[in-house]
Amino acid sequence: MSSIRLPPPVVIPESQSTVDVYIIDTTSYMSMVPASSFVEPLVSGFETLNAGSYAFLIEHTSSKPSKHDTMVFDLGVRKDWEHLPDTFVAAVKEEGWSIDVQTDVASILRDNGQDLKSVGAIIWSHWHFDHVGDPQTFPSSTDLIVGPGFKQGVMPGWPTAKDSHVNETAWQGRKLIEIDFSGEAALDIGRFQAYDFYGDGSFYLLNSPGHAVGHMSALARTTADPPSFMLLGGDIAHHCGEFRPSPYTPLPNMITPNPLSNTLLACPGRLFLSIHPWKDPERPFFDPTVGPGWHDEGVLAKDSIDKLIEADAYDNIFPVVAHDMTLVGTVDLYPNKANNWMSRGWKEDTRWGFCGDFTPLDEEMVARNGQVEVLEGHHEVRDSAQDPKVTSIVHMESTDVDKKAKLHDPSFV
């Protein structure tokens, strides 16, 4: 048994306050998008990005109700996407992308009995077309919340700025709020700059720059005892292969559930190690593209991903990035709540699902070895080397399939 490096402590203030989180399938679907615009180097089987987009409904309850107790994080692609700015629509058609949108988030909420007047704010993780939707489908009383630098770096929008990719109608006639990560509500969570949105530790916005000006993620406390958190990633990563495997979450010798088949129990991790660009079981498959592509600053995007890697090392933090379609079939989608994700094992069941996007060099090995009963790479509780008071979850090689992660100390994760 060889130990794996312990992750740095990710300290989150203790709180008994939570928010209800709902993962919304926005019905947006994009295909034929070159993966090289987002990640490098390419891995066999993942040459194009074909993905949907998630939004989130956030509901907060407290003794002092506020306008923002009900919010939506991201909106996916607007249904009438050809009404996006002319320069963007022309570029999409020239590149040969395919975009399909069945409905919009406002309609999804309304069809499930949600009064849109109760939605106090829309939070944009960032201003790209597959996240901004159409805020005009919400009442003008719904505020629009954006990340730092938005007003200076993105405004004015189209059509005032003819080359803009953002419709300025999104914020016209409604309150536009830009988050300040240096203000009174600011703190650090791990290496993220954070903003305690409600002031009670239930919902934090995270500064995660690099992909776009003002990019933000969020950390929602989904249960208080034991503490669990869902990290709403936005586009902090476009594929889970950008933050897995890692020194804290290495590629296991046997992967279960099998990402290549629903009929075999597991498959050997070496199938994917064979196509790993660096043949390193402790390094992510991808880096964000640094050259021409969709990232505003690729180096800064990599720094945000490195912070995500540290958070992902903890089993009570569940990153949900906007385009991770491998979650479908495991997680509950709106109108069902997602707060019980940890007790239901969603992270464990989906951790390596992204490997199913790849084409191993020798898939016949799956049939020969896919039903091996010894599963390695389960979790074990160890004290942090940096601070013995901090309980860390680390990955250990083990033949004990019943060994599970114990619960975290309520003050730390």
From Swiss-Prot:
<dbReference type="GO" id="GO:0044550">
    <property type="term" value="P:secondary metabolite biosynthetic process"/>
</dbReference>
<dbReference type="Pfam" id="PF00753">
    <property type="entry name" value="Lactamase_B"/>
</dbReference>
<comment type="function">
    <text>Gamma-lactamase; part of the Fusarium detoxification of benzoxazolinone cluster involved in the degradation of benzoxazolinones produced by the host plant. Maize, wheat, and rye produce the 2 benzoxazinone phytoanticipins 2,4-dihy-droxy-7-methoxy-1,4-benzoxazin-3-one (DIMBOA) and 2,4-dihydroxy-1,4-benzoxazin-3-one (DIBOA) that, due to their inherent instability once released, spontaneously degrade to the more stable corresponding benzoxazolinones, 6-methoxy-2-benzoxazolinone (MBOA) and 2-benzoxazolinone (BOA), respectively.</text>
</comment>
<feature type="binding site">
    <location>
        <position position="131"/>
    </location>
    <ligand>
        <name>Zn(2+) 2</name>
    </ligand>
</feature>
<feature type="binding site">
    <location>
        <position position="211"/>
    </location>
    <ligand>
        <name>Zn(2+) 1</name>
    </ligand>
</feature>
<feature type="binding site">
    <location>
        <position position="126"/>
    </location>
    <ligand>
        <name>Zn(2+) 1</name>
    </ligand>
</feature>
<feature type="binding site">
    <location>
        <position position="323"/>
    </location>
    <ligand>
        <name>Zn(2+) 2</name>
    </ligand>
</feature>
<dbReference type="GO" id="GO:0046872">
    <property type="term" value="F:metal ion binding"/>
</dbReference>
<feature type="binding site">
    <location>
        <position position="235"/>
    </location>
    <ligand>
        <name>Zn(2+) 1</name>
    </ligand>
</feature>
<comment type="similarity">
    <text>Belongs to the metallo-beta-lactamase superfamily.</text>
</comment>
<keyword id="KW-0479">Metal-binding</keyword>
<feature type="binding site">
    <location>
        <position position="235"/>
    </location>
    <ligand>
        <name>Zn(2+) 2</name>
    </ligand>
</feature>
<dbReference type="GO" id="GO:0016787">
    <property type="term" value="F:hydrolase activity"/>
</dbReference>
<feature type="binding site">
    <location>
        <position position="130"/>
    </location>
    <ligand>
        <name>Zn(2+) 2</name>
    </ligand>
</feature>
<feature type="binding site">
    <location>
        <position position="128"/>
    </location>
    <ligand>
        <name>Zn(2+) 1</name>
    </ligand>
</feature>
<keyword id="KW-0862">Zinc</keyword>
<dbReference type="InterPro" id="IPR051013">
    <property type="entry name" value="MBL_superfamily_lactonases"/>
</dbReference>
<dbReference type="InterPro" id="IPR036866">
    <property type="entry name" value="RibonucZ/Hydroxyglut_hydro"/>
</dbReference>
<comment type="pathway">
    <text>Xenobiotic degradation.</text>
</comment>
<keyword id="KW-0378">Hydrolase</keyword>
<protein>
    <recommendedName>
        <fullName>Gamma-lactamase FDB1</fullName>
        <ecNumber>3.1.1.-</ecNumber>
    </recommendedName>
</protein>
<dbReference type="InterPro" id="IPR001279">
    <property type="entry name" value="Metallo-B-lactamas"/>
</dbReference>
